[in-house]
Amino acid sequence: MKISGILLFSLLLVLESTAQNKKQRVIADNKKQYIFSDTAGITASYIAYHGDRFPLTDLITIDSLSISQASLKGKTVFINCWFVACQPCIAEIPVLNELEKKYRSDSTVFIALTFDKADRIRSFLAKKPFHFQIASLPQADIDSMKKISFYPFSAILNRQGQISFVLVSWPGGKDSDTQLLTLLDQQFKKALAQ
């Protein structure tokens, strides 16, 4: 068990360093924009398209708060899919917290979906705060919502509940936080205006 854990951790480190050395690629089609790490190895055909509804179900957060479909109507929603052992996921949390702080209001909702168990999430949050409303779901449920299994994954939904932006596997690297914040800020402003 220990050896397989060490091997998995080593593989994740290699994959992470490879991802950070690659540039991002943008797939654009009729004002639809999807950004992927070059290492993601996916095309836009795997992603729910711009204008589609994100199939979010009613949720219960790890703090026992209810997030219903009805409560999201008319709100701009940021959804992030992550997990505790995902280093790229963890690396982007400070940027996501900054975005949440800037746009926190009654007309916005920031949701983080993870397949980690509530106890593990709480232990993680004690060391590294994440200011989104966090819900734990089975991994298969999360992957079926976002239609791919890559992490981290973020989607911005406009007030009509339609996907206005998708980001998969941010590549990291020098000035990465600033670039990511600028990109997400621009895309969130667009969604607020829709």
Feature map (PLM): residue ranges:
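N-terminal targeting signals for export/organelle localization
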Residues: M1-L56
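Conserved redox-active cysteine motifs that mediate thiol-disulfide chemistry
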Residues: C81-E98
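Short, internal strand/loop/helix patches
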Residues: I111, L125-Q160, F165-V168
